[in-house]
């Protein structure tokens, strides 16, 4: 067998409001069933002649493998999430407050998401996202829906098998019982491990490392805050003449004639330059302005990125 069973972590007889019978049934039948199904699928895949296997057969097996593997992993996290006293996680409250505004707001959203799945099925997951170095509450309608790149650290199983033995259709009472049994020390340990995972490496234009750039979100934040900033559209003339829109508040200037218009700019306010995609033209224009003594930066991703975030544009003459 390729995948080994993980012994149950929590002590079923000590849980508050969740019966030993419920936990045993859930662990043995649903978690165990997922693991057995996963190993059966794995065995089938290992024996396949991929070159001779019809595409629909391979697709079906890989789909079933994804569902069974995620079900196995999420159930292991679910049982690892139980066994505590469910008290407010003082050592972890600062992290939840940082990412959700407050501990109460995190709890309110997590519980509401569980209650919203009552009568249906799915998962509510507390997930760490290395890309943004933050936690989010994730909804999953089934075992195949998990956040790409996310690391789950707490799992609430909202499939009926997780509560019907004790609670029948009263999923709200089940969610309350789950919250009373969270092992926060385990959640914190998993968070600490997840937080050590580095975010994806940014793709850098190394030839422009010496020129500072800002994201379109940072540009929008400056404008929304009313900060004085000079926005220069430096898209090449031949490109600009074929387009209709320009970033709201920007003025177009020919990037090939910087010396002709640099004197128009205020030396007391920062300058943000953008071209089409944030490559050579924008960077070189920002570099020329910096050489002239201006506080200039280029916009990462250029005009295309500005439109992608929904930044306001207007028609140009």
Name the predicted role of every residue range.
Residues 1-202:
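Feature for soluble, non-membrane regions of globular proteins
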Residues 196-229, 237-272, 276-317:
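Rhodanese-like catalytic fold shared by cysteine-dependent sulfurtransferases
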Residues 233:
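ADP-ribose/adenylate-binding Rossmann-like module
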